[in-house]
């Protein structure tokens, strides 16, 4: 992986290397899921949203009419269609019920492998951590690899 510049003024460069998935989704509330995804990649099609479990009706409605799990799927779709090789997901299942959370993690893992993206997840959930390939634990300002 190429080095990402830390120089002042290089935020454009960093934005194209890291896609973010927030706990609170950060969707544009007056747009549809497809329009939200196309903000990141104007060539994105409905297929990505279908692969993430949204049906045609959900894809065409306002994002505020979707459940939390459906909105999180839209946020993940935005990250997946970006050109960024790294996805940083901050508590991507924090607002979701256990079943939806499991679905989201499985989808994120499968689709990131399909699209060759590195996913870094920040979480307090043991279940989410257990689904990861590598777990790093931050404790008392020390970062250590945790054995699974």
Predicted regions and their residues:
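Conserved ABC ATPase signature
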Residues: 62-66, 70-72
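Helix N-cap at the start of a conserved alpha-helix in ABC-type nucleotide-binding domains
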Residues: 98-100
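Hydrophobic anchor residue at the start of the ABC signature
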Residues: 76
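Conserved ABC nucleotide-binding domain
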Residues: 6, 48-64
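Catalytic Walker B motif of ABC-type/P-loop ATPase nucleotide-binding domains
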Residues: 87-90
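ABC ATPase NBD coupling module
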Residues: 1-19
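Conserved catalytic motifs of ABC-family nucleotide-binding domains
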Residues: 83
């Amino acid at each position: 992986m190429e080095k990402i510049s830390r120089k002042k003024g290089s935020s454009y460069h960093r934005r194209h290397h890291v896609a973010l998935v927030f706990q609170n989704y950060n969707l544009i509330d007056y747009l549809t899921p497809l329009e939200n995804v196309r903000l990141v990649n104007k060539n994105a099609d409905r297929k990505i949203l279908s692969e993430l479990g949204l049906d045609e009706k959900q894809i065409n409605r306002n994002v505020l009419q979707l459940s939390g799990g459906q909105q999180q799927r839209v946020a993940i779709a935005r990250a997946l269609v970006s050109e960024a090789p790294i996805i940083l997901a901050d508590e991507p299942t924090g607002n979701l019920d256990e079943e939806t959370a499991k679905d989201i993690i499985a989808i994120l893992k499968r689709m990131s492998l399909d699209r060759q993206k590195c996913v870094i997840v920040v979480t307090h959930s043991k279940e989410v951590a257990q689904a990861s390939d590598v777990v790093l634990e931050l404790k008392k300002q020390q970062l250590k690899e945790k054995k699974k």
